[in-house]
Amino acid sequence: MKKIIITGALGQIGTELVIKCRERYGTENVLATDIRKPEPHSPVKNGPFEILDVTDRNRLFETVRYFNADTLMHMAALLSATAEKKPLVAWDLNMGGLINTLEAARRYQLKYFTPSSIGAFGISTPKVNTPQLTIQQPTTMYGINKVTGELLCQYYYVKFGVDTRSVRFPGLISHVKEPGGGITDYAVDMYFKAVRKGHYTSYINRYTYMDMMYMEDAIDAIIKLMEEDSVKLKTRNGYNLSAMSIEPEMLKQAIQVYYPDFTLDYDIDLERQDIALSWPDSIDTSCAQEEWGFDPKYDLPTMTKVMLEAIEKKQKEC
């Protein structure tokens, strides 16, 4: 990977992916793109940036040509909870952007990455230690988009030889960007509220287990997968990833190690709760481990320490 374009670069994953890729491959070799301008203090502003609507195919192709890209990391998407509120917008953005970026990868012979999600599973999926290959019948527009995306990526690999790669991300925890419309974002919000208010009201019920992972592990996983020799990848699209399976009470207890007076109560959002219940409690990540060495470094205690320290630092700087 020598010249990388990242779409959705101002999103939760995109922002940190841009930072890491610029550190690893050189600032001028990573073009960040998004549909809006970066905020004045955005870390993305330290290098090349273009406003890009991924549903505009001609503009996308033009951007690939002028930057002379060899890799496209497509992160632009409407997330799970937001997609349920705006299903037609979600279809147009998530599927239109996906097919356009896949076409760009085919036409210009790009290495290609896009994330899938645990949202690609549904209520008929085995809930504990969910296998890599299993039933996928999601009940949300976001999940339908993700399953379709996995199939399209595999189609472009088999039909056209495009070097497509993707992973099924769990909930991702980060202090760089605040919650952005995902079902698992309660966990991120709980950390911020613990520092700022000492209390959090969760919209997800206790004992609702979902897979999670610290963002640094997620970014490292993308880069590790993209740098792996193509011949070693048997699964290729939609690798299960997770670092931990947690529920709100577990997160509360981890926070109370540092904030003993932190309190948690519940005001359940039934729509988001139903979506959470349709997802696995835990997933099997053995394919990612065996094929390209997936090995997350952060568990719940280490993630909690890092998250709280980073948010405290932000508070002092405000």
Swiss-Prot record:
One of its GO terms (biological process) is threonine catabolic process. This is Uncharacterized epimerase/dehydratase SERP0194. InterPro entries: Epimerase_deHydtase, NAD(P)-bd_dom_sf, NAD(P)_epim/dehydratase. Belongs to the NAD(P)-dependent epimerase/dehydratase family. GO terms for molecular function: L-threonine 3-dehydrogenase activity. It comes from the Bacteria.
